[in-house]
Amino acid sequence: VRDAYIAKPHNCVYECARNEYCNDLCTKDGAKSGYCQWVGKYGNGCWCIELPDNVPIRIPGNCH
């Protein structure tokens, strides 16, 4: 498990405005919790706590 930005296909973050949206998204994929990281490295994106290793995360490089 790891703490990371959860990724959509093509290495894009899930953009957000509310913590509840990210918490629901992250826990649905098996994370302990999640919140909306405002003005982070990739803008406003969902950050997950203890996200399982099999779930894609945002990695360095372009969002396609």
Swiss-Prot record:
Keyword Nucleus: no
Keyword terms, alphabetized: Disulfide bond, Ion channel impairing toxin, Neurotoxin, Secreted, Toxin, Voltage-gated sodium channel impairing toxin
Gene Ontology molecular function, alphabetical: sodium channel inhibitor activity; toxin activity
Annotated Pfam families: Toxin_3
Chief location: secreted
S-S bridge residues: 12-63, 16-36, 22-46, 26-48
Entry's Gene Ontology BP terms: defense response
UniProt subcellular location: Secreted
Tissue expression from the record: Expressed by the venom gland.
Membership in a protein family: Belongs to the long (4 C-C) scorpion toxin superfamily. Sodium channel inhibitor family. Alpha subfamily.
Role of this protein: Binds to sodium channels (Nav) and inhibits the inactivation of the activated channels, thereby blocking neuronal transmission. This toxin is active against mammals and insects. BmK-II is 6-fold less toxic than BmK-I.
Record remark on domains: Has the structural arrangement of an alpha-helix connected to antiparallel beta-sheets by disulfide bonds (CS-alpha/beta).
The protein's name: Neurotoxin BmK-II
Species of origin: Olivierus martensii (Manchurian scorpion)
